[in-house]
Amino acid sequence: MNKKLNKKMKIDRRVTYYLMIDTETANTQLIDGKLWMNDAQVYDVGFAIVDRYGRVYVRFSVVVTEVFDGMADLMESAYYANKIPQYHAQLANGSRVRMTLMQVRRLILSLMEEYNVRAVIAHNARFDWNALNVTQRYVTKSQYRHFFPYGTEIWDTMKMAKDVFADRPTYKRFCEKHGYMTKHKTPRPQLTAEVLYRYLTNNPEFVEAHTGLEDVEIETQIFVACMAAHKKMRRKLWED
């Protein structure tokens, strides 16, 4: 366990626990002006056990060694390759740890069992779900195809936020004021984690770190805000 990150809190069986997760990837390609991420390889996984009020019970920041160390050329394609020196410094000081992808998976699944996790949550969860599956299939030569076991409930805070915030007048005004509208024929408020967190903190200058655990921390606050709204909303990744 990464002692710089974790002071494990006692498990309370009356509490419902969730696993928040975020990934950063290499092998993203720009095709026709759009980022193609279907072959993305995960090099950074941040995850935390949280409750609906944002209390953090355990958290990890992990560099996936097969990609970060074993695919040096590929890492140059990472969307945020300029952060690579930062990763090396944090690995040296212990604020991040190296693991193989299968070690990451075993750790996550053991935490999910230990805390009886209700759901795995990510912002734009389809991307993280897909990237973890793609990477696992690559490093195991398809011996293991799915990162999360069949039946794992996946929630998407982007979908939740769309139902909670997209039509909220104060959110729409905030996005219009600061230029956070989509480029659709009829512009709509953006629902990126960065913009949502700017709204929640009333800080339009906030810049998302785009590193796994740091993004988990802001996405946890988006989850908390959605739950606190007590509004009917879609949660599951595959829910229409």
Question: Model-found features: residue ranges?
Answer:
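Conserved non-catalytic scaffold segment of RNase H-like nuclease domains
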Residues: 3, 8-133
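Conserved protein kinase catalytic core
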Residues: 28-30, 162, 221
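Structural signal for conserved beta-strand scaffold positions within catalytic alpha/beta enzyme cores
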Residues: 61-64, 153-159
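Short, polar/flexible loop-turn hinges at active-site or ligand-entry regions and domain interfaces
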Residues: 88-95, 142-148, 203-208
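Hydrophobic residues within well-ordered, non-membrane alpha-helices that form the packing/core
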Residues: 112, 132, 136, 161, ...
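Acidic, Mg2+-coordinating catalytic module of metal-dependent nucleases/exonucleases
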Residues: 119-126, 130-131, 176-240
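Substrate-recognition/cap helix-loop segment adjacent to the acidic, metal-dependent catalytic center
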Residues: 127-155
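Short alpha-helix plus adjacent loop in nuclease-associated cores
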Residues: 155-182
